[in-house]
Amino acid sequence: MRLWFCLSLFIVLCLEHFPGTLADERNVPESEEKTEQFLRDLPKINRKGPRPPGFSPFRGKFHSQTLRDLPKINRKGPRPPGFSPFRGKFHSQTLRDLPKINRKGPRPPGFSPFRGKFHSQSLRDLPKINRKGPRPPGFSPFRGKFHSQSHV
């Protein structure tokens, strides 16, 4: 890392001492004149010719059409049932159907939307789990170097 830093610093210092490089361009008003000329020419550059239909500087699914055509794209037809712009477990159904999904039926015992060691049982069953029986000696719910022994 230090080698790259020293090398890049050395190159910059060398470039500043040669004529016609960074040191000269920094203080020369010609570069400002070029910038002003470029800004004056920008409207001409933009008006060179009309863009072809369907052209967009953006790339993507909805950018092959111009921005004016976006409302037409949205109104092309009704979306199929179950369509959602989001992808995921709960987005295969529309947002209106989410309450129906939740009310479909009772969840199976042990089901939980969370995954993990303590989530295989539902939250209602946690007190029962804790009261099932005495913990074996040396048991700790924590895992680690100092948790293999029980605290007395």
Curated annotation (Swiss-Prot):
Main location: secreted
Compositionally biased region (Basic and acidic residues): 28-44
Signal peptide (residue range): 1-23
Tissue expression summary: Expressed by the skin glands.
Region (Disordered): 28-152
Disulfide bonds: none
GO molecular function, one term: toxin activity
Location of the protein in the cell: Secreted
Record-linked InterPro entries: Bradykinin (IPR009608)
One family name in Pfam for this protein: Bradykinin
A GO biological-process term: vasodilation
Highest taxon above the source species: Eukaryota
Cellular component annotations (GO), alphabetically ordered: extracellular region
Keywords assigned by UniProt, alphabetized: Amphibian defense peptide, Bradykinin receptor impairing toxin, G-protein coupled receptor impairing toxin, Repeat, Secreted, Signal, Toxin, Vasoactive, Vasodilator
Family per record: Belongs to the bradykinin-related peptide family.
Record function comment: Potent vasodilator. Binds B1 (BDKRB1) and B2 (BDKRB2) bradykinin receptors.
Protein name stated in the entry: Kininogen-1c
